[in-house]
Regions:
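Short low-complexity stretches enriched in small and charged residues
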Residues: 24-33, 96-99, 160-161, 218-219, ...
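Short, glycine- and charge-enriched coil/turn segments that flank and shape catalytic ligand pockets
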Residues: 2-3, 42-44, 106-115, 175
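Active-site loop segments of alpha/beta catalytic cores
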Residues: 119-286
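N-terminal basic, low-complexity leaders that serve as flexible interaction/assembly modules and, when applicable
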Residues: 1-91, 228-229
Length: 286
């Protein structure tokens, strides 16, 4: 049964209904610009401790809405909690970002077990806590990274502009790379469904490094098709839950992404010609 918040201006707008005003929310609306966030972050000891503490992450999720009249809360978490759930060591280094134990060979992919969804239970607890405290006219957004983006981090071992290790891996071991994509696809689908069951009223899928696949002419195979499979699985169970797709830096292939996935709402990057994209999408929402 869908848990749709019909009073939310955000949900009404994302579903193409008339609303009183344009809803506002920010992808990173909780964070270091808030002194109250910095205080909690300091007490938590580490970024990951904060992400995996339901009470603290719920408080951080709600902080921006106490300061600003935003229309939605987006859960405070990180896309790399998924590699953590399959025992890939992860740490965040100051001024460098995430570092995790990289996948070095094909064998590691076939031995990889993505079954520890209970490891992510603190995220679902956080969603439930936020939902219980959120005003009814505010929506709650859950999210996850898309398979290609997560795979890129798991092979590279850290963030990168061009992800050379990942590119080399899928160029030389495409069958094994697709095995990793498929495993992640299944896990991410289940993770997002669990978020909906915990209270999320909309879901965002972050394909943050779509540009890497695009450069290698693999955007459809590595990004669009896995995203589409995740969307279809969620929609079979929760057809009314809106899903937002963000294939960052997809350039002229944003339209193809929307056409194939039938996504409810599209997030775009700063390089997009909005007027041109709207003309290409016709009646689709942005």
């Amino acid at each position: 049964m869908d848990k749709l918040n019909n009073t939310s201006n955000f949900i009404k707008t994302i579903n193409g209904l008339n609303s009183s005003q344009t809803p506002i929310w920010l992808m990173r609306q909780a964070g270091r610009y808030l002194p109250e966030y910095r205080e909690i972050r300091k007490g938590a000891g580490s970024f990951l401790n904060l992400c995996m503490n339901p009470k603290l992450s719920a408080e951080v999720t709600l902080q921006p809405l106490k300061r600003f009249d935003l229309d939605a809360a987006i859960i405070f978490s990180d896309i790399l909690t998924i590699p953590m759930a399959c025992n890939r060591d992860l740490k965040f280094i100051e001024n460098e970002g995430p570092h995790l134990k990289p996948i070095e060979n094909e064998r590691e992919i076939f031995e990889l077990e993505l079954t520890s969804i209970n490891y992510l239970e603190p995220i679902y607890e956080c969603l439930s806590l936020v939902k219980s405290q959120l005003e009814t006219e505010k929506a709650l957004i859950g999210f996850a990274g898309a398979p290609f983006t997560i795979a890129a981090y798991m092979i590279e071992g850290k963030g990168s502009k061009n992800f050379p290790k990942c590119v080399s891996f899928f160029q030389n071991y495409e069958k094994s790379f697709m095995e990793l994509i498929k495993k992640l696809e299944s896990f991410i689908s289940n993770h997002l469904i669990k978020q909906i069951e915990a209270g999320a009223e909309a879901i965002q899928i972050f394909e943050s490094h779509a540009e890497i696949a695009l450069k290698e002419n693999k955007f459809k195979k590595y990004c669009i098709e896995p995203n589409n499979n995740i969307i279809r699985k969620i929609k079979r169970k929760y057809p009314s839950i809106p899903i937002i797709g963000f294939p960052r830096n997809a350039k002229n292939l944003y339209t193809e992404y929307v056409s194939i996935t039938k996504i409810d709402c599209l997030s775009i990057d700063q390089n997009v010609n909005i007027k041109g994209l709207l003309n290409n999408l016709k009646k689709k929402k942005v």
